[in-house]
Amino acid sequence: MPRRPSTGTQSDTPALHVVPSFYGVYLLQSEPKPSSFYIGSTPDPPRRLRQHNGDLKAGGAYRTKRAGFRPWRMLLVVYDFPSKVSALQFEHSFQHCHETRHIKQEERISKNKLSGRTLHHKVANVALLLRSSYFRHLPLKVLVFEEAVYNSFMNNKFVTCSHVDLLNTNFNEYFSVMEKDLDSTVDSWKTRHTNENEIWSMAKEAVILGSPRCALCLEPIEQVPETSSPISKRSDLQRYLQSESLPLVTMCYNPQCRDVFHLSCLGHRFTNSDGFQSLIPATVNRCCSCNAKLEWRTLAKIATKLRYYVLKDSLQLPSQVLENDDNYESQNVNDS
């Protein structure tokens, strides 16, 4: 039977990737049944936990709705994924630690689908994934909300937990949106978004409203699309982006610098510095102008957000193009 012609399905919808402000993979534990765990991913952990516990009617997951398992508590969140796709890759690997390609067979502590049900196993598997050849190149961090989980990392029963970027905190305090007299250097949900809003305002002023040149190649930067034709297909958008008519542009977010760069120019400089060549930039680099420390993830976030800001109206892109939904339902609950 011949294939039916495309009717503009979701897979054909043009979508621009934007590095999310927050995307994490979380581990839940049932309070009535402590040996039952659930693994999922979300851009909004407080909202997601309320869905799992039935406080919100919409959302949640079938497996966490079963009688006798609620309430659930969130034990940890692995976060700072550069995309929803990379978060789902980590989530799937976390759910299938006994067979994932991201943990070497000789290093696996979960030997089959039914093994690895203790908290020590969960913590050790997180650490194994974080040091894998793929995920270690992402600047991933771990939030821990329970003392027992933190102690498990510290005890390091399976000798896997070295070099984990760990923050031991309180779930409600970290994700609080209430005004608090917090030190601006404290890592929290509120200060994180406040800092990002300030950086975004600087970026728009420097790149969109100004007439900058790349501080490396000295070429002028024009953030104006060369076409106003609406784009209705993903393939059309890909062809437009590959034409390099609107390159990714970023900015040093040191307020005393604010120099503008092509992301490709920075990437080339960061991967060919000090006579050493690497495949990808380090997670933290130095500004070529002011020598301030810059996170590559933040530079990429600025660049993708600027591109979306410029293109979304000019090319009449659909409004829902960001990777920020959490409708994916995990299929992994370990029951006692």
UniProtKB/Swiss-Prot annotation:
It is found in: Nucleus. It comes from the Eukaryota. A zinc finger (SLX1-type) spans 214-290. GO terms for biological process: DNA-templated DNA replication; double-strand break repair via homologous recombination. The keyword Metal-binding applies. It is an enzyme of class 3 (hydrolase). GO terms for molecular function: 5'-flap endonuclease activity; crossover junction DNA endonuclease activity; zinc ion binding. Residues 21-104 form the GIY-YIG domain. Residues 37-57 are annotated as: Disordered. Keywords: DNA damage, DNA recombination, DNA repair, Endonuclease, Hydrolase, Metal-binding, Nuclease, Nucleus, Zinc, Zinc-finger. Forms a heterodimer with SLX4. Catalytic subunit of the SLX1-SLX4 structure-specific endonuclease that resolves DNA secondary structures generated during DNA repair and recombination. Has endonuclease activity towards branched DNA substrates, introducing single-strand cuts in duplex DNA close to junctions with ss-DNA. Belongs to the SLX1 family. PANTHER family: STRUCTURE-SPECIFIC ENDONUCLEASE SUBUNIT SLX1. This is Structure-specific endonuclease subunit SLX1. It comes from Scheffersomyces stipitis (strain ATCC 58785 / CBS 6054 / NBRC 10063 / NRRL Y-11545) (Yeast). The gene is SLX1.
